[in-house]
Amino acid sequence: MKFSVGPLAVALVTMSGIAVFPAIGSAEPDTPTPTPASETNSRTAILPVFAQEGIRVRTGKPGELLTIHLPEDVPLAPAQWRPDGDATYRAADTEYTVTPLIDGGEYFTIVKKNPGESFDYKVRLGLPAGTHWVRHGTTLLIESDGAPDNPSLLVGMFASPKVTTGKGADIPLTVEIDSDATVTLSARSPELANTPVEIGFSYHPVDATT
């Protein structure tokens, strides 16, 4: 799945798929799915054995990778691999699973087994040189830096995250990002208590053309 987006594009990203305004570009409407086992060797993401090294994914700028650092408040065990290419990093009561997608992106799943009535996770982004982030609600766009003769282009995007409890309830999520590109995912609700909670979000590279 590839996207060709003009410099004035505003992408709308939801957990059910990706849509780009028809006047600017188009994308397949289907939801991104995990990469089949036969294709995992060709994925472009780099999933390290140790999570603290950062998960590196491609952007629409050739050769430029975005680094995604999982929360570092507690040590994570080395990656456990599945045949389909998933990597899971575990802490005492939390699991982080990274699943390769067919468009070269990754789907991130955070499972907290015994949460209280709130949680707070910080995901740090290492942006490649010559790029910056732009927020649209709970969607985060990665764009190239613009210049008078070189307009800014969309080169990657994070879909809006979603929180679901083990009882099937959807919980409102607060998303904040600071000047250092640290994204904080937090929620507070009595429905979070005494039930497993799953937070899911995805990253997608965008092959932009002028």
Give each language-model segment a name.
Residues 1-28:
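Secretory targeting and sorting signals
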Residues 27-210:
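Residues that cap or anchor secondary-structure elements
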